[in-house]
């Protein structure tokens, strides 16, 4: 499941790209399919990084082999000033107590006119989850805030970024999380949850055109994520 549209980023050979909070590497694998990039991924989870390294090593269609994944704190990034052409931060800020410090760090390491892409859960879809289930927002390491569209945009532009595009993604995933909140987040045996998950996995693997068209239609209405495309300076 990819949240960031890489074709929007105009990446070129020798561009240096960071996925800040890379998790299991979903965006790193997409970046590796772009020829000639220098790719970095950081996360706080050693287990996730281990899985990411394995998946990157075994990619049969990788066009960029110059990559490094390592453990690091997004509030204290181990990189020099102005060292990246692009930074991706997808579904991370909602987990971080000091999210403003994280933004300052990403601003610091970006080159002038560099690209920042930030995605977070969309207010409407997330608010429903919080309303249905206390466990959803009380889970350790989970989401600690909900962003409104204007609120986050103003925070990003207040840091000096220029926002040139906003879009929405993963509309078909919103009902899945509402269902999980209704039946219990850890209840994987519920009939509806089990088969909806299989449907989503099938969609991710097969990408059937009618389902892709349906989600594109629904994204502005009930997209699970909101994505901000920004330029530094």
Could you say what each language-model-derived stretch is?
Residues 119-120, 169:
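Alpha/beta-hydrolase-fold catalytic nucleophile elbow
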């Amino acid at each position: 499941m990819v949240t960031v549209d890489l074709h929007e980023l105009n990446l070129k050979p020798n561009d240096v790209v960071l996925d800040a909070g890379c998790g299991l590497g979903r965006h790193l694998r997409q970046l590796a399919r772009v020829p000639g990039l220098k790719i970095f991924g950081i996360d706080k989870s050693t287990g996730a990084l281990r899985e990411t390294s394995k998946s990157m090593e075994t990619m049969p269609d990788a066009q960029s082999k110059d990559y490094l994944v390592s453990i690091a704190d997004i509030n204290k990034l181990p990189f020099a000033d102005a060292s990246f052409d692009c930074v991706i931060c997808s579904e991370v800020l909602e987990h971080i107590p000091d999210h403003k410090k994280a933004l300052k760090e990403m601003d610091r390491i970006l080159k002038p006119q560099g690209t920042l892409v930030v995605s977070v859960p969309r207010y409407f879809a997330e608010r429903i989850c919080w309303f249905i289930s206390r466990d959803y927002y009380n889970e350790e390491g989970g989401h600690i805030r909900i962003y409104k569209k204007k609120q986050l945009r103003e925070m990003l532009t207040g840091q000096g970024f220029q926002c040139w595009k906003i879009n929405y993604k993963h509309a078909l995933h919103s009902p899945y999380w509402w269902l999980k909140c209704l039946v219990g987040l850890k209840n994987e045996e519920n009939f509806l949850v089990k088969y909806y998950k299989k449907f989503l996995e099938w969609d991710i693997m097969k990408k059937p055109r009618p389902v892709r068209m349906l989600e594109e239609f629904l994204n502005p209405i009930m997209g699970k994520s909101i994505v901000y495309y920004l330029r530094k300076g």
